[in-house]
């Protein structure tokens, strides 16, 4: 049973990595990063349940990771919207300069 869950988590992580590498849109990059975080959470909860089914340490840690990922997404989207307001684009290759 754990093998199936780990395969699903690895598959989602690979999809997120592929999207992160090939995407040219900043919002898609953030979505792929969130997909990678969630796939790690799936594997974390699966391993936690497999090794110690009595404890909920893995689930609690996954909730903390979700909270941190939500804060990261909010900050990332705020930065993307601020850059869009100035550059009128969300393409990754246009944000290689730090000056406006």
From Swiss-Prot:
Keyword Cytoplasm: no
Pfam families registered for this protein in UniProt: Oxidored_q2
Transmembrane segments: 1-21, 27-47, 61-81
Reactions accelerated catalytically: a plastoquinone + NADH + (n+1) H(+)(in) = a plastoquinol + NAD(+) + n H(+)(out); a plastoquinone + NADPH + (n+1) H(+)(in) = a plastoquinol + NADP(+) + n H(+)(out)
GO CC annotation: chloroplast thylakoid membrane; NADH dehydrogenase complex
This protein's UniProt keywords: Chloroplast, Membrane, NAD, NADP, Plastid, Plastoquinone, Quinone, Thylakoid, Translocase, Transmembrane, Transmembrane helix, Transport
Keyword ATP-binding: no
GO biological process: ATP synthesis coupled electron transport; photosynthesis, light reaction
Top-level taxon of origin: Eukaryota
UniProt enzyme class: translocase
Localisation per UniProt entry: Plastid, Chloroplast thylakoid membrane
The enzyme's E.C. designation: 7.1.1.-
Main location: plastid
Molecular function via GO: oxidoreductase activity, acting on NAD(P)H, quinone or similar compound as acceptor; quinone binding
Membrane topology: Multi-pass membrane protein
InterPro entries in the cross-refs: NADH_UbQ_OxRdtase_chain4L/K, NUOK/Mnh_C1-like
Family: Belongs to the complex I subunit 4L family.
Entries under HAMAP family matching the protein: NDH1_NuoK (MF_01456)
Task of the protein: NDH shuttles electrons from NAD(P)H:plastoquinone, via FMN and iron-sulfur (Fe-S) centers, to quinones in the photosynthetic chain and possibly in a chloroplast respiratory chain. The immediate electron acceptor for the enzyme in this species is believed to be plastoquinone. Couples the redox reaction to proton translocation, and thus conserves the redox energy in a proton gradient.
Oligomer status and interactors: NDH is composed of at least 16 different subunits, 5 of which are encoded in the nucleus.
Name of this protein: NAD(P)H-quinone oxidoreductase subunit 4L, chloroplastic
The encoding gene: ndhE
């Amino acid at each position: 049973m754990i093998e199936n869950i780990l395969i699903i988590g690895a598959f989602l992580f690979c999809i997120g990595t592929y999207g992160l590498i090939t995407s040219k849109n900043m919002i898609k990059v953030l979505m792929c990063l969130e997909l990678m975080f969630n796939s790690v959470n799936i594997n974390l909860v699966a391993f936690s349940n497999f090794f110690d089914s009595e404890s909920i340490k893995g689930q609690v840690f996954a909730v903390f990771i979700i909270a941190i990922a939500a804060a990261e997404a909010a900050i990332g989207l705020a930065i993307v919207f601020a850059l869009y307001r100035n550059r009128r684009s969300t393409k990754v290759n246009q944000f290689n300069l730090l000056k406006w």
